[in-house]
Design a protein with these regions (language model features):
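Short amphipathic beta-strand starts and helix->beta connectors
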Residues: 60-61, 247-249, 283-286
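Non-catalytic interaction/Regulatory regions outside core domains
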Residues: 4-5, 27, 339, 347, ...
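Short Gly/aromatic-enriched secondary-structure transition segments
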Residues: 93-97, 212-219, 274-284
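Internal alpha/beta scaffold segment
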Residues: 268-294
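Short loop/turn motifs at secondary-structure junctions and domain boundaries
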Residues: 377-383
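Non-catalytic, conformational "gating/processing" segments within enzyme and secreted inhibitor domains
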Residues: 104-270, 291-376
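Detector for small/aliphatic-rich hydrophobic stretches
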Residues: 2-7, 14-162
Length: 384
């Protein structure tokens, strides 16, 4: 059984649409909605669908006690890689990432807008999204592939001697810098067949719109999903929040800053677990929950905690339909004309929730390598 934590920037929820009065006027003005075209709005829904699917698969495959992922980070890193795919490999990636019905230009423009707009919509919240592309010295990458990652993903591109011991340190130092040192290391070594790393890093620091007072934090029991009671530092406040409940759970939306970003908490009831709810939760159901939230005074008890995770996402992504990309039959001919495949997708995360707010980070690494060289049979006629 798992105590499940989700920190995913779900784009449909980044701007509050609730205009009801809050308990104090000494608050930042609400964020202005991001202007999206119909196609970009459609892509938002697709990306959120990918987020829910990925989260469910990670829960199924992970043995971690706590599960905390950033689907946005995974989506961006795979979006960079998708530009190098071709044929059936590309089609499978589009299906897993839920990109159907959109052109290459529309998809890349969507990622560009995310990365240029999200960090600016709340001046009280720090959000950075950074991308990089590292390739082995002497590896001849097609210029179109490099250019699309520079133009749309603002990727830092560097040729690196992967055979040197300091190559790992160089990549890890970039990740550490882009996550405010919350994720200091993502790679232990670079395999001999690795030729490229496509990396996304996200850092988030948000201050609660309604902060908890430290004097109200006390030791209290917390019952995990195994039914065990453990002592935690339980924060408390009474204020006005967007809230709803049904026969399955209670729902609470706790905004940061100007409400551009928020943490929506699901508290199961009537014998349900978080895993039970998430197993069947769809984007449409999630949107319905958000629309049913209404402002009311709530007494909030919330644990202060921190958590970090490391995941290998190969199996979850394969189970989502991205099969060929991880095999010798993969087609990444838009990177080079040689035979390449995705050898690993690594995902590291960190989150800390305190009385003041939330600090979190995520790094997704897509490792691309040469496929195994096929054994050529020898037929030597040197005897009758």
């Amino acid at each position: 059984m798992k105590k499940i934590l989700l920190f995913a920037i779900l784009i449909l929820g980044i701007v509050s649409c609730n205009d009801e009065t809050e308990s104090t006027s000494q608050l930042p003005p609400d964020a202005k909605p991001i202007a999206l075209t119909d196609g970009q709005a459609k892509r938002v829904g697709q990306d959120n669908g990918f987020a829910f699917d990925l989260f469910r698969k990670v829960i199924d495959f992970s043995k971690e006690t706590n599960v905390f992922i950033s689907p946005l980070s995974v989506s961006i890193a795979l979006g960079m890689t998708w530009n190098g795919a071709a044929g059936e490999t590309k089609s499978e990636m589009e299906s897993a990432l839920k990109m159907s019905g959109m052109s290459v230009e529309e998809i890349n423009e969507y990622y560009r807008i995310l990365q240029t707009t999200l960090p600016t919509i709340d001046p009280t919240t720090k959000l950075t999204l950074a991308n990089s592309l590292w390739y082995r010295s002497g590896f001849q990458v097609k210029s179109d592939f490099l250019n699309v990652n520079i133009d749309y993903f603002d990727a830092y591109v560097r040729e690196l001697d992967f055979s040197k011991a300091w190559a790992v340190d160089t990549i890890n130092q970039w990740c550490a810098k882009k996550t405010n040192n919350l994720i200091p290391s993502v790679l232990d070594n670079i395999p001999e067949d690795a030729v490229m790393y496509l990396i996304n890093a996200i850092y988030f620091k948000g201050i609660w719109r309604h902060q908890f007072e430290k004097k109200n934090t006390t030791q209290a029991d917390f019952t995990n999903e195994a039914g065990e009671k453990v002592k935690v530092n339980m924060m408390f406040q009474k204020d006005t929040f967007a809230y709803a409940e049904d026969e399955k759970a209670q729902y609470l939306d706790m905004p940061y800053g100007n409400k551009a970003f928020s943490m929506t908490v699901i508290l199961p009831k009537n014998g349900n677990t978080t895993a039970d709810l998430l197993k069947y939760l769809t984007v449409d159901q999630w949107n319905s929950i958000l629309q049913n939230l209404s402002m009311r005074e709530v007494e909030v008890y919330f644990p202060r905690f921190s958590s970090k995770n490391k995941f290998l996402l190969n199996d979850p992504l394969i189970d989502m339909g991205m099969k060929l990309a991880f095999t010798d039959n993969a087609d990444f001919s838009n990177i080079v004309d040689e035979n390449l495949f995705i050898s690993r997708v690594l995902h590291n995360t960190y989150i800390e929730v305190t009385e003041e707010g939330t600090e979190a980070a995520a790094v997704t690494v897509v490792e691309v390598g040469y496929t195994s060289v096929p054994i050529i049979p020898e037929f030597r006629v040197n005897k009758p």
